[in-house]
Amino acid sequence: MTQKKLLVSNSEITRCIFGSFDKHARRLEEAFGVRIFNRADENGAGDCIVIEGEDGAASRAHDALSYMKKAASLGDELSDQSVDYVIRMISDGAQNELAELDDDCFFVTARGKPVKAKTVGQKKYVDAINKNTIVISTGPAGTGKTYLAVAMAVKALRKDNPKNTHFKNWW
């Protein structure tokens, strides 16, 4: 049985990580077969999230919680869907790809909300838009294709770089 700790300096971030009624923590416990609980830091510097479980499981849960801490500290909302995505990526051994997602805020809305790829597939799509003149994308509805394409187009227009942004009047 291994015990790992994650220090969190802000209790609001801890609340975001654990989720309402600790649902995110319970989801992580079920997925990785660990026990997660929160204690006050011994030095009084915030909270200490403690993970207990087998070596590999505790490490995976620690990686997931570290990513969630980083996302929460950047102001991202940790939804049930995003927590499930983190669990799936960590379980598949894709920690490095997951870590790259938060590094790419490519646009900020008028209300100050950062626009960035939330999945590895979206990151590949944004990279393809940046590298290619034309990108044709297909996929299930609701996966962010149009949202990201419009955000990238507005970004190009704001940079006074409309030469790579073509809008065709279809009517």
Which functions belong to the PLM regions below?
Residues 114-130:
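Pre-Walker A adenine-sensing motif
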Residues 137-139:
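Hydrophobic anchor at the beta1->P-loop junction of P-loop NTPases
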Residues 15-38:
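Short amphipathic alpha-helix segments
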